[in-house]
Amino acid sequence: MSTIQQLVRKRRKKIKKKKKLAALDSCPQKKCICLKVHTITPKKPNSALRKVTRVKIISISKMFTTAYIPGIGHNLQEHSMVLIRGGRVKDLPGVKYKVIRGCLDAAGVKNRKNGRSKYGVKRPK
């Protein structure tokens, strides 16, 4: 506990709240350019090769982040334009964003019947 004299000399510091999704900058989505498309392995109990992409956010020139590519198969490559949204992947440390499928250069998932809206698939006729 500080004394009154100590508080007169130096005020208490305000604790700044850290943003969970700094790259989105209070926006629902951001447009990005793919720099590298690769796979990474998940944390301990799980085992797989998860598809991720290293992206550069267009509006924030020096901001780079990693985004997860959901669904089976993708057509993304270097210099593809993608739209990212928030939403972390629990077993991939440091991955806090997801690519929106069916938008810009990211094609929708083929032969998808359920949960189509998250994978950019139109309603079957």
From Swiss-Prot:
SUPFAM superfamilies linked to this entry: Nucleic acid-binding proteins
Q: What name is this protein filed under?
A: Small ribosomal subunit protein uS12c
Please name the GO terms that the record assigns under molecular function: rRNA binding; structural constituent of ribosome
Summarize the subunit comment.
Part of the 30S ribosomal subunit.
Q: Does the keyword RNA-binding apply?
A: yes
Family in the record: Belongs to the universal ribosomal protein uS12 family.
- Give the GO biological process terms: translation
Q: Name one GO cellular component term.
A: plastid
Q: What function does the entry list?
A: With S4 and S5 plays an important role in translational accuracy. Located at the interface of the 30S and 50S subunits.
UniProt keywords, alphabetically:
Plastid, Ribonucleoprotein, Ribosomal protein, RNA-binding, rRNA-binding
Identify the domain of life: Eukaryota
InterPro entries, per database record: NA-bd_OB-fold, Ribosomal_uS12, Ribosomal_uS12_bac
Where does the record say this protein resides? Plastid
